[in-house]
Amino acid sequence: MMILVTILCYFAVLLLIARITGRKGGSNAAFFKGENQSPWYIVSFGMIGASISGVTFVSVPGMVRGMDMTYMQTVLGFFFGYMVVAHILLPLYYKLNLTSIYGYLGTRIGVRAYRTGSFFFLLSRMLGTAAKLYLVCLILHTYVFQEMHVPFWLIAVGSVALVWIYTHKSEIKTIVWTDTLQTFCLIAALIFIIYFTIQRLDLNFSGIVQTIQNSEHSRIFVFDDWVSRQNFFKQFFSGIFIVIVMTGLDQDMMQKNLSCRNLQEAQKNMYCYGFSFIPLNFLFLCLGILLIALAGQMQLELPAMNDDILPMFAAQGYLGQSVLVLFTIGIIAAAFSNSDSALTAMTTSVCVDLLNTEKDTEETARRKRSKVHLSLSVLLAFFICLVEILNNKSVIDAIYIIASYTYGPLLGMFAFGLFTRRQTNDRWVPLIAILSPLICYLADWWIGKETGYKFGYELLMLNGTLTFAGLICMSKKGKTLKVP
């Protein structure tokens, strides 16, 4: 009952924020870009929660057991990726005054490239958001609501409905402020869970440092194994490109940046936001080491799945009942902050890129937007329930793989537009964008079978390179399309 009351109180605060921030809004410009009035420091803080999903909240501490602290190599790459986004992509988006960032592809390459970029974003975001929300709903069902005999589908529908309620009228500026609250709750939950873990271990500060340093899982850098997915250069450069495509080429993440007052504030937001990932992910990994140490001290058998380590400690009371409340708040905050912005960004992409509502009257555009927002919410709930019906871990993995593969063509198309002075044949763009991920999948399967080499995130770079090469092959020298 305490968990249910916590969730209801949390949602009530979200509704209050939505009501306050949406009081003077309602226009399409406000919904899509917040009338360019969002304070950069609020956007920066809130974007942390939007990037850290519920999956991250439970997965990063657990991944320590399987790959030590080598994830920090990727996190370091993230920071340099954010610098690329701040100094190459953000100036472009502000110069063109874009609502949807894929409008650049239409201006630079052609209408089919524009539609293709938007389609790949929608596919990736819908599948990725459904998979993330599924795992969060599953955790809530297993550890919180199962005793109340609440069916999974009701949790899924309820979660999406809650997000729809406070986003369907309240615009991107509401998302900016609700994400700020949710980021605060997420970070507070993480810090308090670490605190209770340290209490159980009965450690002072020097003891904490010593426990982490002496752990067999404290390794961060891997320079000596080129085959391993944890090799430094694979992880570091993959981190750079992951940020470029999953932040810089993602409507969800860029929409908040475009709601800032000007380019300079958006860049400051990106600097602070990018740097904050380093200490935050380090804390998640340290929590993982401390939980493993606590399991050894208490002689507990850890679950087979790494993702179940933190939920086990929280749900079974090993850290006290307060941690279960904190864990629930952290999961809900991470899930909502990721899903609300994704739903708003998908609505923007469908309305602006596919339905071209910017040419409609204000009232017509608003009606279309409301219908699209509701339809996408229903579709999201359907996909979450579909994954539950299939109930197959390999299906969830496949969804993540498909979602990640769809960013490669976006990388290739934007790279072609930014770094070449050629015009490609626009009608071939959809085919090239489809073939590139398929070739990557076959290459991953064949090379793994023949040589044992394991592709990691570098598949993203290969995918983008293939798309880039395909566009080059279908292009000719000449003047580029005129870009404002």
Predicted feature residues:
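Membrane-embedded helix-loop-helix hairpins and adjacent transmembrane boundary segments
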Residues: 1-484
